[in-house]
């Protein structure tokens, strides 16, 4: 089995070269341990199909690939027919680092799909040991690499990745295309494998690199959630932030309670102050009326005093002029009805008479009132008499004030008339 000569199991011919005298038996992988070809010209087939054709029509060439994919000196081989009678072609072998050999083969499907060859075409690259794309080597006669088909004839366009997870899209068992998010490779490289379930359903998974290299994907940090708080939760079982929040809330509630109690205490005083506002307003209005009346009386008094002063000034000026006339030697004072000095005495006499008449009328009114008071028994009290006298005094003061105003107006008119005379001006 491992290179020893034996009778073939499936009808393969095991012949030896009579010229060389040595027989090169093929091992399990149709080569020696490291892929070096033997010097036998006539190969002996293994149990899985020799040169006459295996169970699935694969051809076992005598020469095997070397360690680095170099083309060995192979003898001619006779291809056999496969299970369905198709003439297969030699399959390209990959070297250790993915270099492609010169004879590509497009394997056939299970149900013997036609495998055509065209001249010329490029050979399909195969994956190396580390997933590197094998370099295509040109040859004189090439055939196109046929796409491998799945079990039911579906197109299988996926390629496998290398050791360090280069891109390799895969398909499902039934040939359906499926996608899978990028997974991390051995050293954290981003890969694009697409995996699926047994029936072609999309299986989106994401793995972590073996050495935890950085990946270009968003990371979500889940914050620790606070424990659930219910009626049976104790204060000591809460965290520090929740305890601080509860303490601040308790202080705020206590301060609001104190403020409410203080307002409740001051509520009676505030109510009294509010109720006293209308009374205070009425008192202020009454005092305002009194002040207004006093201001009016004072204004009248000032006007009266001003008129008296003006009148006295006019009289003093007239008197000084008359004295100047008498001081002049040989001068005589004219006696006429329009003499200012005569007018002065006439006005003074008239004013005195008016005042005497006013006083007499006032006294007469008082006598009449007093007689009425005396004849009324219920009004004989001293308080009623005193009140009556005070009211009469106010009346007299108002009348005298008014009389003084009229008198001042008359005097002003007289002074203006007297100043218009030639000898006074």
UniProtKB/Swiss-Prot annotation:
Q: Where is the composition biased (Gly residues)?
A: 47-56
Give residue spans, biased composition: Low complexity: 11-27, 112-126, 135-150
Highest classification ranks of the organism: Eukaryota, Fungi, Dikarya, Ascomycota, Taphrinomycotina
GO CC terms: cytoplasm; nuclear periphery; nuclear pore; nucleus
Q: Name one GO molecular function term.
A: nuclear localization sequence binding
Encoding gene, per UniProt annotation: nup45
Ordered alphabetically, the record's keywords are: Cytoplasm, mRNA transport, Nuclear pore complex, Nucleus, Phosphoprotein, Protein transport, Translocation, Transport
Q: What does this protein do?
A: Functions as a component of the nuclear pore complex (NPC). NPC components, collectively referred to as nucleoporins (NUPs), can play the role of both NPC structural components and of docking or interaction partners for transiently associated nuclear transport factors. Active directional transport is assured by both, a Phe-Gly (FG) repeat affinity gradient for these transport factors across the NPC and a transport cofactor concentration gradient across the nuclear envelope.
Region described as Disordered: 1-207
Q: For this chain's UniProt record, which GO biological process terms are given?
A: mRNA transport; nucleocytoplasmic transport; protein transport
Name the chain's protein: Nucleoporin nup45
Main location group: cytoplasm
Q: Which residues carry this modification: Phosphoserine?
A: 289-290
Q: Name the domain of life this protein comes from.
A: Eukaryota
Q: What is known of its domains?
A: Contains FG repeats. FG repeats are interaction sites for karyopherins (importins, exportins) and form probably an affinity gradient, guiding the transport proteins unidirectionally with their cargo through the NPC. FG repeat regions are highly flexible and lack ordered secondary structure. The overall conservation of FG repeats regarding exact sequence, spacing, and repeat unit length is limited. FG repeat types and their physico-chemical environment change across the NPC from the nucleoplasmic to the cytoplasmic side.
One of the Pfam families matching this protein, by short name? Nucleoporin_FG
Stretches of Polar residues bias are at 1-10, 28-45, 72-89, 167-207
Give compartment(s).
Cytoplasm; Nucleus, Nuclear pore complex
Q: Which organism is it from?
A: Schizosaccharomyces pombe (strain 972 / ATCC 24843)
Q: Which InterPro entries match?
A: Nucleoporin_FG_rpt, NUP58/p45/49
């Amino acid at each position: 089995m491992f290179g020893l000569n034996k009778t073939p199991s499936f009808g393969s011919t095991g012949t030896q070269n009579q010229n060389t005298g040595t027989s090169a038996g093929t091992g399990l992988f149709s080569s020696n341990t490291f892929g070096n070809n033997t010097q036998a010209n006539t190969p002996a087939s293994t149990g899985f199909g020799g040169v006459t054709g295996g169970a699935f029509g694969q051809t076992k060439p005598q020469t095997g690939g070397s360690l680095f994919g170099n083309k060995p000196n192979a003898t001619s081989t006779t291809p056999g027919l496969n299970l369905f009678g198709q003439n297969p072609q030699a399959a390209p072998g990959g070297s250790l680092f993915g270099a492609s050999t010169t004879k590509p083969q497009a394997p056939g499907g299970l149900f013997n799909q036609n495998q055509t060859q065209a001249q010329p075409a490029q050979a399909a690259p195969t994956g190396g040991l580390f997933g590197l794309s094998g370099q295509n080597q040109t040859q004189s006669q090439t055939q196109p690499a046929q796409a491998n088909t799945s079990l039911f004839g579906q197109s299988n366009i996926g390629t496998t990745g290398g050791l360090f997870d280069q891109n390799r899209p895969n398909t499902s068992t039934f040939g359906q295309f499926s996608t899978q998010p990028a997974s991390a490779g051995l050293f954290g490289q981003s890969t694009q494998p697409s995996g699926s379930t047994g029936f072609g359903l999309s299986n989106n998974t994401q793995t972590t690199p073996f050495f935890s290299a950085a990946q270009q994907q968003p990371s979500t940090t889940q914050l620790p959630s606070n424990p659930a708080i219910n009626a049976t939760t104790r204060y000591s079982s809460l965290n520090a932030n929740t305890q601080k929040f509860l303490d601040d809330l308790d202080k705020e509630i206590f301060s609001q309670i104190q403020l409410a109690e203080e307002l409740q205490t001051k509520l009676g005083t505030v109510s009294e102050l509010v109720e006293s506002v209308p009374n205070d307003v009425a008192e202020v209005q009454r005092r305002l009326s009194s002040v207004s009346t006093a201001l009016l009386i004072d204004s009248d008094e000032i006007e009266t005093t001003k008129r008296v002063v003006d009148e006295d000034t006019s009289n003093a000026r007239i008197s000084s002029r008359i004295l100047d006339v008498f001081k002049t030697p040989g001068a005589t004072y004219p006696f006429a009805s329009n003499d200012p000095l005569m007018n002065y005495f006439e006005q003074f006499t008239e004013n005195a008479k008016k005042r005497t008449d006013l006083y007499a009328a006032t006294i007469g009114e008082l006598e009449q009132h007093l007689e009425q008071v005396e004849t009324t028994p219920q009004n004989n009290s001293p308080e009623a008499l005193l009140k009556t006298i005070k009211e009469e005094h106010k009346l007299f003061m108002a009348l005298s004030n008014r009389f003084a105003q009229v008198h001042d107006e008359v005097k002003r008119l007289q002074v203006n008339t007297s100043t218009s005379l030639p000898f006074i001006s």
